[in-house]
């Protein structure tokens, strides 16, 4: 059993695994993380909406689980999903793997522009911190998820987290520019 967190704009006691985007890193599903601090930093403020962190327990026993590391297999799976190709793991209950840092720091266009080789794009995706995402892809997985609580974040929390992300992004973009220069 692991504790997982979902950042969003509403309390979600029973997630819909078919609601998410098909072209997200790990395909369509309900995205969570086991890193509480990252969940708090990941969420963005949305005008007219509460900013909510939902907390759950996930029982992995009895589920078909695929785990990725930051490697070529992960890279190919993420890029396949980003290109909206058929999801080869659609029948897997839970997919666990790193978040592609371009998602966090808005550099996707450079990586998917076609101007980089796959090796160069992967090198760029591996810059920066490695945060895990845990994606529930089937109804069976959702049935193994137990809602524990939700918390509405206030403006002070959101501002503090925004500053942390800004600092991380600045360091990431500095390293990104350095690697881009090396690739030129």
Predicted region positions:
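Short linear motifs at secondary-structure transitions and domain/linker junctions
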Residues: 4-10, 28-34, 108-112
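Extended catalytic/binding region for NAD+/ADP-ribose chemistry, centered on the ART fold
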Residues: 21-46
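Conserved NAD+-utilizing ADP-ribose enzyme module
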Residues: 24-25, 45-52, 58-184
């Amino acid at each position: 059993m692991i504790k997982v967190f979902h950042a969003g704009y509403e309390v979600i006691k029973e997630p819909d695994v078919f609601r998410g985007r098909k072209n997200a890193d790990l395909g369509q599903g309900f995205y969570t993380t086991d890193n509480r601090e990252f969940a708090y930093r990941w969420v963005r403020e949305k005008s007219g909406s509460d900013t909510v962190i939902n907390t759950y327990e996930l029982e992995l026993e009895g589920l078909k689980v695929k785990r990725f590391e930051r490697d070529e297999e992960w890279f190919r799976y993420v890029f396949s999903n980003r290109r909206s190709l058929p999801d080869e793991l659609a029948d897997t209950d839970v997919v666990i793997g790193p978040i592609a840092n371009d998602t966090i720091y808005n550099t996707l266009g450079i990586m998917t522009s076609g101007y980089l080789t796959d090796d160069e794009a992967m090198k760029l995706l591996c810059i920066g911190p490695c945060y895990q995402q845990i994606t529930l892809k089937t109804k069976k997985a959702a049935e193994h998820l137990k809602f524990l609580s939700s918390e509405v974040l206030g403006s002070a929390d959101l501002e503090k987290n925004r500053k942390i992300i800004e600092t991380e992004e600045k360091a990431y973009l500095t390293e990104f520019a350095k690697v881009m220069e090396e690739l030129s």
